[in-house]
Design a protein with these regions (language model features):
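Active-site acidic carboxylates
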Residues: 1-108, 116-117, 135-140
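Alpha-helical scaffold elements lining the catalytic groove of polysaccharide deacetylases
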Residues: 111-136
Length: 143
């Protein structure tokens, strides 16, 4: 089984949301993600989904990437991918969230800011189920 993963393909990481965490030309990856998915049996989506009361939030980008002292949200970040905002949305041209075979929403809890889709926190104790799902599907390749 081949699984294709669309990793955080959201407007927050593009010039479409310049006040969040824009990556130059980040919005131009859709064609490649769709081509990659055409080679797979299953398509997975990961998505940052942050809370307005997140304890790692700072207003000014100058204050980003500073230690928070929190065990599962180690650094400060400006608001990005806040649920319900434009930055939270998937890029245009991708399937809707309901059309993916499996989805992982990361960072929903205000005290958590994980950097991956397999665990909800930095200590890697709270599993998202992605690894287990891939094992159950007999995944032998991930793209």
């Amino acid at each position: 089984m081949i699984v294709s993963i669309d990793v955080d393909a959201q407007k927050t990481f593009t010039p479409l949301c310049p006040d969040e965490l824009p990556v130059n030309e980040g919005h131009l990856i859709v064609e490649e993600l769709n081509a990659q998915a055409a080679l797979a049996d299953l398509r997975v989506m990961t998505k940052d989904a942050h809370h307005a009361a997140a304890k790692w939030l700072v207003d000014n980008p100058v204050d980003m990437l500073k230690p928070t002292g929190l065990p599962d949200a180690d650094l400060t970040w400006v608001a990005h991918a806040m649920v319900g905002t434009r930055g939270y949305e998937l890029l245009d041209g991708l399937p809707s969230a309901k059309e993916y075979d499996y989805s992982v929403w990361q960072g929903v809890d205000p005290e958590l800011h994980p950097y991956g889709a397999c665990f909800h926190e930095i200590e890697e104790k709270l599993r998202t189920g992605m690894i287990e799902r891939m094992r159950c599907q007999n995944t032998d390749k991930v793209i």
